[in-house]
Amino acid sequence: MAQSRSLLLSIAVNALLVGVLLYSVAVNRTQEGSLQLSAVRGKIAAPRTSFQNAVSRVSRNQLPSSSRKAVAQAFLSNPDMVPDMGKRKLMNNLVLAAVAPVVASAGGCYLYYFYPPQTGGGGGAVGALDALGNPVSAESWFKSHKKNARDLVQGIKGDPTYLIVNDDGSTLNSYGLNAICTHLGCVVPWDAASNKFKCPCHGSQYAPDGHVVRGPAPRPLQLAHVEDDNGKILLSPWTETDFRTGEKPWWA
């Protein structure tokens, strides 16, 4: 799940970069068109003055009728005097049309990454999922996990979260522990032999309740509420006081 979310974020960033590039092309073409139009207008000015002088002479009957007609046709048929702005506008519209879906898809990936689809009830609760994305039932969990067992499910926002089986072997602890190390984000495995969570990346260690017993981790593991709702395991955000520190949760 974490890898797929990282991939989605990478796609979103790349798509946004493509969108910015295409938009820059459209803007540059528009500015280029404005500069070319100004240049064309400058070119038009001199012929137009010549034409006006010619018309003035024509009006004074200084040219024969055949010459008057030739002057008018020469001016009106000169293609350099009329810039083809229709094609330029069409190209700009096509570029902008290409940018729109790219930006929209990038925004969709961004929203999916930071607000992934969740299962579960109201109040911010989500259903625990196994590694394949299937809902985890309390019955199946207790069949495969003994008392004091700590094992991972996909929890809030897809984060790996430890469920803790109580001493009776048939109920879950009222809180779960987010398995992401508070140092640099590695997933911290549970070491039953030492009764600690031990980070394999930089050596941080956590007690069974998730508080730090050895750095460099600066903060305890994040808590989540755990509830058995008629056999369905639900997790919800922990926003009240952190019972391990007596303070407001650092993640809230």
Swiss-Prot record:
Keywords, sorted A to Z: 2Fe-2S, Chloroplast, Disulfide bond, Electron transport, Iron, Iron-sulfur, Membrane, Metal-binding, Plastid, Thylakoid, Transit peptide, Translocase, Transmembrane, Transmembrane helix, Transport
Any one GO molecular function term: metal ion binding
Major site of localization recorded for this protein: plastid
Record-linked Pfam families: Rieske, TM_PetC
Annotated Rieske domain residues: 141-235
Record-linked InterPro entries: Rieske_2Fe-2S, Rieske_2Fe-2S_sf, Rieske_Fe-S_prot, Rieske_Fe-S_prot_C
Transmembrane feature ranges: 94-114
Note: This protein is 1 of 2 subunits of the cytochrome b6-f complex that are encoded in the nucleus.
Recorded family membership: Belongs to the Rieske iron-sulfur protein family.
PANTHER family: CYTOCHROME B-C1 COMPLEX SUBUNIT RIESKE, MITOCHONDRIAL
Protein name, UniProt field: Cytochrome b6-f complex iron-sulfur subunit, chloroplastic
